[in-house]
Amino acid sequence: MKIEVDSFSGSKIYPGRGTLFVRGDSKIFRFQSSKSASLFQQRKNPRRISWTVLYRRHHKKGISEEAAKKRTRKTVKHQRAIVGASLELIKERRSQKPSDRKAARDSKLAKDKEAKKAAKAARKAEKAKAVASGASVVSKQQAKGSFQKVKATSR
């Protein structure tokens, strides 16, 4: 004796009971009662209808043997070296006090600022030297050859 399962409610359908619905794409749906068939045709979600097996499963109703819970794997963080920084260097930086780190950052910023200022001064001096030597200052447009208007010759 083959016992079928209701496509909507999940309840058992014994031989000689229920109806069969074959959709246009040849998928077969079995319904235990006209109630579940009607709800299926209304496109109701069986997980939201409280008497269906799917609802009970979804809301964990009537499950008494919950002793064996599923074991989940815990993710463990590992420190690994990055390209350009060894593990020791990373650990050393992590263990630094925030005040020390801030002081190091400030000193580096000051050093970079000084280097930038020096480079700017050097460029300025080079430009002044070029002007003093009497080199003619040519604008970019003149160097390219500015647009020359063609004179009309028809008159």
UniProtKB/Swiss-Prot annotation:
Protein keywords: Cytoplasm, Ribonucleoprotein, Ribosomal protein
Pfam family, one: Ribosomal_L24e
Entry GO CC: cytosolic large ribosomal subunit
Entry GO MF terms: mRNA binding; structural constituent of ribosome
GO biological process: cytoplasmic translation
Amino acid composition bias (Basic and acidic residues), ranges on this chain: 89-129
Chain spans, region Disordered: 87-155
Source superkingdom: Eukaryota
InterPro entries the record matches: L24e/L24_sf, Ribosomal_eL24, Ribosomal_eL24-rel_N, Ribosomal_eL24_CS
Classification via Gene3D superfamilies: 6.10.10.140, Ribosomal protein L24e
Subcellular location: Cytoplasm
Transcription listed as a keyword: no
Composition skew (Low complexity), residue ranges: 130-143
Family: Belongs to the eukaryotic ribosomal protein eL24 family.
Task performed by this protein: Component of the ribosome, a large ribonucleoprotein complex responsible for the synthesis of proteins in the cell. The small ribosomal subunit (SSU) binds messenger RNAs (mRNAs) and translates the encoded message by selecting cognate aminoacyl-transfer RNA (tRNA) molecules. The large subunit (LSU) contains the ribosomal catalytic site termed the peptidyl transferase center (PTC), which catalyzes the formation of peptide bonds, thereby polymerizing the amino acids delivered by tRNAs into a polypeptide chain.
Subunit comment: Component of the large ribosomal subunit. Mature ribosomes consist of a small (40S) and a large (60S) subunit. The 40S subunit contains about 32 different proteins and 1 molecule of RNA (18S). The 60S subunit contains 45 different proteins and 3 molecules of RNA (25S, 5.8S and 5S).
The protein's name in its UniProt record: Large ribosomal subunit protein eL24
Encoding gene per record: RPL24A
